[in-house]
């Protein structure tokens, strides 16, 4: 008995879709997969318009994308964990971090739905609501919104906050918010993953704090520049600082060893005078070098004790002039 097999016919649109995806995968080196579950189609259209010239956004079936990726030579196994649920595929040659930063700044809002929490302060503004007086008045009363009826319409008499950021939005307020055109819920594309030249970057690693990033870069630059100065790396900006540092070190060394040149003489003598003052301060009670050393004011009892000590010292033989001269000579590099 002959077995009759029927070849499964693939829809033409699927073939064309795979070809288009494959072409984009070869054209762009970065592919971003974003979750669009519950994301309004009109808001996705707004994002598509905003990103024109920067990236292309395509909504397609995960299976078709997987086939196209395989045909384009991508490692599909790395992407398979993210090919679940409704997705949008963003094709770009920009850095994925740049795309994430752009999307984070592109704020979108939607109307509240039951169970939503406010992403911003929700205020019912004072003025004409355009709503006819009737059953709606009881809703305003329940929400503790002060109103009045004027020309058959409900007017709110003062701005009223009905929810703060993070608070649940009262279900009774939802139709009023919609009527007034108030959208208190923020939405954004939830990026699952970025595929950049074969590198997989999970979505949670694409968000960076710019201030922290700038601080880290500045610290890295300062460390690198400090090291470059230390080793006198031969580039103009570094050599200028290295030369200044070397000059300061050389001047300090010359002053320390008493090496006199026209450039170092002031530093040498300044250092020597400082040492002379220090020595004079240490031995001023024993010998008069002709250098006035400031003395702190002492109590009368201490002054009397010092006078007695000085009298005893004067009775002893002090150092010879040759010894004193030799000490000063050593201070000045002689």
Curated annotation (Swiss-Prot):
Keyword Ribonucleoprotein: yes
Feature: compositional bias, Basic and acidic residues: 304-320
Region (Disordered): 295-334
Residue ranges, compositional bias (Gly residues): 325-334
GO biological process: cytoplasmic translation; ribosomal large subunit assembly
One MF term in the entry's GO annotations: structural constituent of ribosome
Coiled coil (UniProt feature): none
Gene Ontology CC, one term: cytosolic large ribosomal subunit
Annotated keywords: Ribonucleoprotein, Ribosomal protein, RNA-binding, rRNA-binding
CDD domains linked: Ribosomal_P0_L10e (cd05795)
Function description: Forms part of the ribosomal stalk, playing a central role in the interaction of the ribosome with GTP-bound translation factors.
Family indicated by similarity: Belongs to the universal ribosomal protein uL10 family.
Subunit structure: Part of the 50S ribosomal subunit. Forms part of the ribosomal stalk which helps the ribosome interact with GTP-bound translation factors. Forms a heptameric L10(L12)2(L12)2(L12)2 complex, where L10 forms an elongated spine to which the L12 dimers bind in a sequential fashion.
Protein name: Large ribosomal subunit protein uL10
Protein species of origin: Sulfurisphaera tokodaii (strain DSM 16993 / JCM 10545 / NBRC 100140 / 7) (Sulfolobus tokodaii)
